[in-house]
Regions:
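Small-molecule kinase domains that catalyze NTP-dependent phosphoryl transfer to phosphate-bearing small molecules
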Residues: 4, 10-14, 97-138
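Terminal helix/beta-alpha structural elements that buttress the NAD(P)+-binding lobe
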Residues: 55-56, 126, 133, 144-148
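Short beta-strand-centered segment that lines the nucleotide-binding/catalytic pocket of NTP-utilizing
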Residues: 51-62
Length: 148
């Protein structure tokens, strides 16, 4: 187990930047924007796992890219819509966006979560709700899942 290499892997493959190294992944995290993919991958890297994350955005159809990947390594994330909208509003503020943007609107978050659920259902993968759970708790669930 080389934690430094796992961190480098997580950073290099964050947010679906590239799929060149996906065959080296121990775990593939899917989810809407701001659902906790990146911090989860970094924590999994601290455990020595090569973790890649792929954002699910309805306007960017990733299904053809991910449908043939190893489903036993895939984890789908869902986050409570109101909580996710709140997090996105904070992100908007950090970016200097005032008012309600489409990105942070509750309607958009519901739409993205529904899209993610459809993808997870088509793939038949393990899904975890992030709501009210720590990164450590979710990581522990993932590690147990991967070991079975």
């Amino acid at each position: 187990m080389d934690v430094n290499k796992s961190f480098a892997y997580a950073i290099d493959n964050d947010d679906g930047k590239t799929f060149d190294n996906i065959s080296s992944a121990d775990v593939i995290i899917l989810g809407p924007s701001r659902s906790g993919k990146t911090p989860l991958c970094y924590y999994l890297a601290s455990l020595g796992l090569n973790a890649i994350n792929i954002p699910l955005v309805p306007e960017v159809d990733q299904f053809d890219v991910i449908k043939d990947l190893d489903k036993s390594k895939m984890i789908g994330l869902i986050q409570d819509e109101e909580y996710l909208s709140k997090i996105r509003k904070e992100r908007d503020k950090d970016l200097g966006i005032t008012g309600v943007s489409n990105y942070s609107s509750l309607e958009r978050v519901f739409y993205e979560n529904e899209y993610a659920r459809e993808i997870y259902s088509k793939l038949g993968i393990f899904v975890i709700s992030m709501y009210g759970k720590s990164i450590e708790e979710v990581s522990s669930t993932i590690v147990r899942y991967l070991q079975n």
